[in-house]
Amino acid sequence: MESIMKVAMDKAAEQLIQQFGFDYLQQQLQLQHQNQHNSSPQQPQHQQLEPENEHLTYQYQQSKPTHMQQLACNYQPRHSTTTSSPSSTHSLASGGGSSSNSSNSSSSDSSSINISHISNISNISNIGNISNSNHSNAAYSLAVHSYQKQIESPANPSHVPHHQMDLSPLSENGSPNGTPGAQTPTATASGNTAAALASAAAAAAAATSGGNGSSITNCNSNNSSSSSNAQQQLQLGNYKTNSCWCYGESVCSGIEVEIENNNNNHIHHGETTYHMKILVPAVASGAIIGKGGETIASLQKDTGARVKMSKSHDFYPGTTERVCLITGSTEAIMVVMEFIMDKIREKPDLTNKIVDTDSKQTQERDKQVKILVPNSTAGMIIGKGGAFIKQIKEESGSYVQISQKPTDVSLQERCITIIGDKENNKNACKMILSKIVEDPQSGTCLNVSYADVSGPVANFNPTGSPYATNQNAINSSTASLNSTLGTTIGGANSAASLLVNGTGINLSINLGSPNPAPNLAVATQLLEHIKVAMRGSGYSETVTNEVVAALSVLAKYGVLGMGVGVSHTNGAHSTLGNFLGVTTLDQQTAAAASAATASNVFGAVGQVNLEQYAAAVASAAAASRPTQSQLDAAAVQFDPFRHLGSATAPAATPVSLNNNSFGLTATTGTATTAQLGGLSKSPTPGDLSSKDSKNVEVPEVIIGAILGPSGRSLVEIQHVSGANVQISKKGIFAPGTRNRIVTITGQPSAIAKAQYLIEQKINEEETKRARQIPLTTVVN
């Protein structure tokens, strides 16, 4: 601030001195004309000086006003209530005075003219023998001294932008003129500068009081009239500070700027925005986005919300559903939610059978809403003792369940599944959204891509396996999804389970008897997922439609069969067998058989020596758990091929292995391809109609042995056996007992394997506990 005041005072002194010189020249010219009539001897000298004085006067009049004069006249600072103009400045500074001789010289061009003015004025004063030259007082000397000091150390105002304010004209209604590209002038004057000008003018007026009173009065009157005219012409009120940059708000405005900033934030940002993340089936996401993104763009424009969708092959871990993030006000979020719910109803998903354990009724995907919330928000939705989630169920009429909390630190979200009618689901979503609004941490998980998440993740269907294995995007599927497809179409080893994974599908042609009643509804859904998989792989829309149309014709007449052939199982996709419910031993058996008959893949017969075959299978199964002998003992009655190939039943008679991908049959020796059904013929939809189910009671105190840490044991049992394993909810027991009900669904062989693995887990846990009892006794 001191530097600003210093520059302002120096500039004011410069202007005053210039004005003094102009007024003094006029007075001296008048005195010269009077002296010409009174004293004739001095007339030649006056004639010599008169042209020079007139030249100096003309030069001063033609000089441009200074930067300070223009700014002080045209623009009023934001926080100053006074105005200034060149005329008013002249009127304040008007007055006669005499100057002493100046011996200082100027280094700048702009200052040299003013010095010459002062020196010439001094000469004229000496020649005219004016009595007023003796009345120079200390105040005027101080003003001259300030001007000389300014010459010695010139300051450039352009290098002192400490408090620069952008000014923009006001319109008639008082609002700033927001014309793009308009350049606004800059004001460097302030109230302090105006005060400095006034004080300097007062000092100059006191210094020049004396014999020039009449001329001073005339000058003051003229200057004051010109000042009033200039102020009338300039509409100073039409300018208002629009923005101010300085070293801090406290320098310029204080509370006033703070209020304006708050108002601007309210205008620009509007209502507070919130975030809701939901899961959308892949088959319905295209309808939400629209052709070229037109639908989603129109939705965002109409609602004012932002809708962000994950990429076509980027699914939420453990599912085949894309992630949709909605950002906006609560009203906009609910409008978008209703739109998405309608699109899901128009595009039914393959996972259309999810069992509600409370009502024991099957629910379709179009009656579900899946919401992802952070762990903190999930806790608020559950409420103390489950009070709020119970309230949601009662008031909305929808079934609501939250997935288990994941242990993986990379995934801090839980999935809320809402099942019911559209209106009921909307009411439930509103209640959930109210908790999202209350939670300050609800906006911590705003990502839509989960490509970097690995390990077990929360299952979207909490009634089944609590965790699902995460694979790459096109192969992502939950255990619940696999089991649902298997039970719907005919088991875990079904074409539906095969097709969901997108890759590794063998399409076989059924040349046997026609299928009397092909399941066209299932075929349509399978073909829809083939279409999604092909689009994700980069196929064009034309190619995809042609391929799906051809497959639909084959499926219509029951000619199309889907399954896994030996050639594909031989390492073509390492994780495919697990997803299809094919056990590790089945893959090892198929791999050994394929290696032995590699030269006869498309031939009718391939000779395999069972001794060599048994040795290959035994070596392949040595590293796996459970061992081959244990599984043989559990499933010997269901799988004669594995029984023949076991180490306990060697045979020297070669057995033919038909590896024909078209399902042709042939017999050689004592064994037929009918005994090798899993490897000799790809199943058709007509072959996948049988399923079975079995309930096993497990004590409540030991049910954790089946679940395992983070549910991994249950996932392992399902993958190894190929069966679907469901455990009753906590608190639901078999009648009259404290035993939880474990339901095993699948093919008979898969059920037997799963039951054996469950019993093995229970025995291991009981043995472990029995060993801990003596140790506890000894310690005590």
Curated annotation (Swiss-Prot):
Residues 273-340, 366-432, 691-758 form the KH domain. The KH domain consists of approximately 70 amino acids and includes a conserved hydrophobic core, an invariant Gly-X-X-Gly motif, and an additional variable segment. The third KH domain (KH3) binds a hairpin RNA loop containing the 5'-UCAY-3' motif on targeted molecules. RNA binding by KH3 requires residues C-terminal to the KH domain. Residues 686-776 are annotated as: Required for RNA binding. It comes from the Eukaryota. This is RNA-binding protein Pasilla. One of its GO terms (molecular function) is pre-mRNA intronic binding. Disruption phenotype: In both embryo and larva, results in irregularly shaped salivary glands with bulges of variable sizes, leading to greater distances between neighboring nuclei and decreased apical secretion. Residues 31-50, 76-113, 150-190, 674-693 are annotated as: Disordered. Functions to regulate alternative splicing in neurons by binding pre-mRNA in a sequence-specific manner to activate exon inclusion. Plays a role in long-term memory formation by processing the unspliced Orb2-isoform A (Orb2A) mRNA and thereby controlling Orb2A protein abundance. The keyword RNA-binding applies. GO terms for biological process: mRNA splicing, via spliceosome; positive regulation of RNA splicing; regulation of alternative mRNA splicing, via spliceosome. InterPro entries: KH-I_NOVA_rpt1, KH-I_NOVA_rpt2, KH-I_NOVA_rpt3, KH_dom, KH_dom_type_1, KH_dom_type_1_sf. Keywords: Cytoplasm, mRNA processing, mRNA splicing, Nucleus, Repeat, RNA-binding. It comes from Drosophila melanogaster. SMART domains: KH. The keyword Acetylation does not apply. Expressed in the central nervous system in mushroom body neurons (at protein level). The gene is ps. Residues 79-91, 99-113, 176-190 have a biased composition (Low complexity). GO terms for cellular component: cytoplasm; cytosol; nucleus.
